[in-house]
Amino acid sequence: ETFRELTEYYCGGSASGEENRTAGGGEERLHAIRGIAYRRSGPGREDEICRTPERELTDLSALPFLYDDPGPFENKIIYYESSRGCPFRCSYCLSSIDKKVRLRDIDTVKKELQFFLDHKINQVKFTDRTFNCDHEHAKEIWRYLAEHDNGVTNFHFEIAADILTEEELNILAGLRPGLVQLEIGVQTVNEETLREIRRPSDIDKIRRVVGRIGEAHNIHVHLDLIAGQPFEGYESLGKSFDVVYSMKPEQLQLGFLKVLKGSPMHERAQGYGIKYTSRPPYEVLCTSWLSFEEICRLKRIEEVVELYYNSNQFTHTLPVLEKS
């Protein structure tokens, strides 16, 4: 409970410490470490929590590469980041607090990607918040993967479809089938909700881009929706679902809002009537627009989507059901 309390206390602010140190010698040593929260010791001070000043952000290129031995990761997904941060301000995301984007040195990235290619890792998932927010960075990585493709490894990227350029679309169209898969967060098509969560989106362009990518038949596309957002009730979410479903992605994920501590959404949750679980993942239970019963119904719909759509086992049945 103490660890949980301190973690929640620290995450309630704009914490961004990335280095780890071992401290010994009592409270004075702890106070000298920037970017931590700890409970003071001593008579009458057990309930006092101290938080030290923020530390400077670490150079992303200085972080060590952790996958020098591929053995433990055989037949497993490897997670990798070439950038950290996001220029956008989506209110449910912690990256909205600080809009800085830091890039790992591109030569270092290429060297590390080559390691994955040389060892024929099955899948590498980039954890970059919006991989293509820096267009030159994205293009250089996609070109490198195309030129050094081993015919085995798949790379997963989370992108913003409505900022893809014509040049980027042409690069993607020329990739080996299965080399890349793209996850695109549509989240909602409700304009009022998009404005409230500070997520400007061109839904028409997203639709065109997804269709364009689909024409090449070489990239697995995964589209996301989020239930439980402000101003989106059950009927509105149904409209969002219909729009995304009509884009015919390979995977359609119906997710549920997570009210992350420290995010703008957390600060405004009470005003939205949002109730959520008190422990991680802090998932929405109801809102002023969506009842608990409707959330439960959406959970069942999520299971149906996984079973009948995402399993890809009902490709002949679903078109018939859609007409009925």
Task: Annotate each PLM feature.
Residues 1, 39, 96, 127, ...:
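Conserved residues at the C-terminal ends of beta-strands
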Residues 1-54:
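Glycine-rich beta-alpha loop elements in corrinoid/cobalamin-binding modules
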Residues 14-25, 41-45, 86, 300-324:
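Radical SAM enzyme core and accessory elements
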Residues 33, 37-82:
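N-terminal [4Fe-4S]-dependent radical SAM core
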Residues 53-55, 63, 138-139, 168-169, ...:
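Short aromatic-enriched loop/helix-cap "lid" or pocket-rim segments at secondary-structure transitions
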Residues 65-215:
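Radical SAM [4Fe-4S] cluster-binding motif and immediate context
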Residues 110, 114-127, 152-158, 172, ...:
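Conserved C-terminal portion of the radical SAM core fold
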